[in-house]
């Protein structure tokens, strides 16, 4: 019984490592929504746009924030805390 438990525990650890490696450079839909809404608020409060807004069909702040996100020009870093206490930093700016 102790061996089965250790086997399950090692499988869980392996699953967590695989999960972290797969999702390390991807954002969840909740993170994307949070980033776009935060940037839209900044734009609404008067922050300058990081892209040329003349090339965008719609000039509302959410569309501008979405386009900035798609182009990868946002200087925002997301900090993820994993259950094991490890912290992963994800930069949204594309090199």
Curated annotation (Swiss-Prot):
GO molecular function: DNA binding; DNA-directed RNA polymerase activity
Top-level taxon: Archaea
Keywords: Cytoplasm, DNA-directed RNA polymerase, Nucleotidyltransferase, Transcription, Transferase
GO biological process, one term: transcription by RNA polymerase I
One GO cellular component, as annotated: cytoplasm
Enzyme kind, highest EC tier: transferase
SUPFAM superfamilies associated with the record: RPB6/omega subunit-like
Substrates-to-products reaction catalysed: RNA(n) + a ribonucleoside 5'-triphosphate = RNA(n+1) + diphosphate
Cross-referenced Gene3D superfamilies: 3.90.940.10
Keyword Nucleotidyltransferase carried by entry: yes
Family of the protein in this entry: Belongs to the archaeal Rpo6/eukaryotic RPB6 RNA polymerase subunit family.
NCBIfam families found in the cross-reference section: PRK01099.1-2, PRK01099.1-3, PRK01099.1-4
Subunit description: Part of the 13-subunit RNA polymerase complex.
Function as written in the Swiss-Prot or TrEMBL entry: DNA-dependent RNA polymerase (RNAP) catalyzes the transcription of DNA into RNA using the four ribonucleoside triphosphates as substrates.
The protein's name: DNA-directed RNA polymerase subunit Rpo6
Organism listed in the record: Saccharolobus shibatae (strain ATCC 51178 / DSM 5389 / JCM 8931 / NBRC 15437 / B12) (Sulfolobus shibatae)
Protein encoded by which gene: rpo6
């Amino acid at each position: 019984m102790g061996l089965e438990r250790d086997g399950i525990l090692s499988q869980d650890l392996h699953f967590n490592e695989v999960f972290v490696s797969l999702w390390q450079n991807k954002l969840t839909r909740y993170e994307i929504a949070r980033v776009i809404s935060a940037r839209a608020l900044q734009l609404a409060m008067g922050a300058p746009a990081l892209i040329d807004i003349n090339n965008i069909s719609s000039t509302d702040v959410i569309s501008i924030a979405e386009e900035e996100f798609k182009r990868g020009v946002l200087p925002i870093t997301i900090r993820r805390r994993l259950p094991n206490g490890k912290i992963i930093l994800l930069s949204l700016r594309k090199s």
